[in-house]
Amino acid sequence: MKHLLSIADLSKDDIIGLMDEADRFREALLGRDIKKLPTLRGRTIFTLFYENSTRTRSSFETAGKWMSADVINISAGSSSVKKGESLKDTGLTLSAIGADAIVMRHYSSGAAEQLARWVAPGGVGPSVINAGDGAHQHPTQALLDAVTIRQRLGDIDGRKVVIVGDCLHSRVVRSNVDLLTTLGAEVVLVGPPTLLPAGIDTWPVRYSYDMDAEIYDADVVMMLRVQQERMHGGFFPTHREYATLYGLSAERERKLQDHTIVMHPGPMLRGMEINFGVADAPRTAVLQQVSNGVHTRMAVLFTLIAGQDAAAF
């Protein structure tokens, strides 16, 4: 495996292998006062973000540093990108400096795949990891979500996962649909008609406009933020009406099955898609997702940079 650009590029065995590796990193770090492994000592990782990020960027940085790599953050707003430098020239510059991996978030779908072609022609050059490209893919988010579901519920096969909210603009949805259906889950997308993707009839999912008809027999309820920064029109009448129809209220949370877990890729809009109290409820796995994000990204970085046959510890 040279790059991680899309969940669709991974086989079922690839997915399970990365999840298992994430669990091994978590176990290796348990109880350590100093979270440091020599796994990627002497390696250089660049993070290149053209969009804002808290969880993904800091998680990748932490993952690299916990494996003793040198991690260098490049912000598009404070680099030569601001002067008009192209993505191609930025990527080639980082490659020439000596990058072993480039972790990139970009506002354009397909940008990570294009970068990989530029910096690693013929498979020679740094690995590229897609940290989110437009509304296309966010593969490490789907991997960490699967790791979290497996930790909470055991096997993913046969589980019902309901994803509620702005599915139209969400790269998380697309990656999770690819991954969860590959592992045998039933996936249901719920949202207003204006926030469900065109062509959804061809996806391996069911979809519904009625949240209450789907969530009460679900094993996982995953809430999504309304991505207002990607909207240029009226996708729903008011925030209050949206919260009434598609928000996870305290009343709805009480009616869920006892074992059902609530997830959210973040950032959360408390009071809109999720109630303030529900966001902090014991069944809500948001912070576990964040923790698993570090271990999952350690697994990805290790696999791509050191190689699948290398020893991690």
Swiss-Prot record:
EC number(s) given by UniProt: 2.1.3.2
GO biological process: 'de novo' pyrimidine nucleobase biosynthetic process; 'de novo' UMP biosynthetic process; amino acid metabolic process
Any GO MF annotation of the entry: aspartate carbamoyltransferase activity
Pfam families: OTCace, OTCace_N
InterPro entries, per the entry: Asp/Orn_carbamoyltranf_P-bd, Asp/Orn_carbamoylTrfase, Asp/Orn_carbamoylTrfase_sf, Asp_carbamoyltransf, Asp_carbamoyltransf_Asp/Orn-bd
Any one GO CC term of the record: cytosol
The protein's annotated pathway: Pyrimidine metabolism; UMP biosynthesis via de novo pathway; (S)-dihydroorotate from bicarbonate: step 2/3
Positions annotated to bind carbamoyl phosphate: R55, T56, R105, H138, Q141, G266, P267
Gene3D superfamilies in the record: Aspartate/ornithine carbamoyltransferase
Cysteines paired by S-S bonds: none
Reaction it catalyzes: carbamoyl phosphate + L-aspartate = N-carbamoyl-L-aspartate + phosphate + H(+)
PROSITE patterns given in the database record: CARBAMOYLTRANSFERASE (PS00097)
Keyword field: Pyrimidine biosynthesis, Transferase
Top enzyme category: transferase
Source taxon at top rank: Bacteria
Binding site for L-aspartate: K83, R171, R225
Function as written in the Swiss-Prot or TrEMBL entry: Catalyzes the condensation of carbamoyl phosphate and aspartate to form carbamoyl aspartate and inorganic phosphate, the committed step in the de novo pyrimidine nucleotide biosynthesis pathway.
Similarity remark: Belongs to the aspartate/ornithine carbamoyltransferase superfamily. ATCase family.
Quaternary structure and interacting proteins, as annotated: Heterododecamer (2C3:3R2) of six catalytic PyrB chains organized as two trimers (C3), and six regulatory PyrI chains organized as three dimers (R2).
Protein name per UniProt: Aspartate carbamoyltransferase catalytic subunit
Originating organism: Corynebacterium diphtheriae (strain ATCC 700971 / NCTC 13129 / Biotype gravis)
Gene designation: pyrB
